Amino acid sequence: MRHDVLVYHYHLATRPCERFSRFINSSDYSFATVDTTNDLKALKVSDMKCPNLVNIQHHYKVWGSDKSKLNSLVDLASAIIDPYYAKMKEESNKDKNAWHSVWHERLDEQHVKYVAMDAYTSYEMYRRIVDMRNYLLPDPDEGSSHIAVAG
């Protein structure tokens, strides 16, 4: 199975993109990610909104983690998808200031790969969370509360 990920770096856009704006404002899609803080700031600077932006941290908590802290992308992906994702943290263990300082510039290959991996991982986690909820929620037409009692 193949998945395509579009990386649109709107910080470098020289003019507003009407198609992109319509896409992120569409009620047909939800956009899921981990920690929406910077996304919301960047969208605001670009004078854009994304009404269906989902912060996965508010929909899933890793069992046994500190209840007062939000889980990271790696923690969530390791718990929801596969423990293999714990290696992502080791691979991206770089100088945080240097790593984060270039997001407003043209992205190098490492950052583009990270963005694509982040996007796919967020998609897969949210898909699994939605699936889990769909299987756990009772069917409104079934169950003992819907059985007619003969009197």
Outline where the language-model segments fall.
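Conserved DEDDh/DEDDy metal-dependent 3′-5′ exonuclease domain
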Residues: 1-128
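Acidic two-metal-ion nuclease catalytic site recognized across multiple nuclease folds
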Residues: 117-151
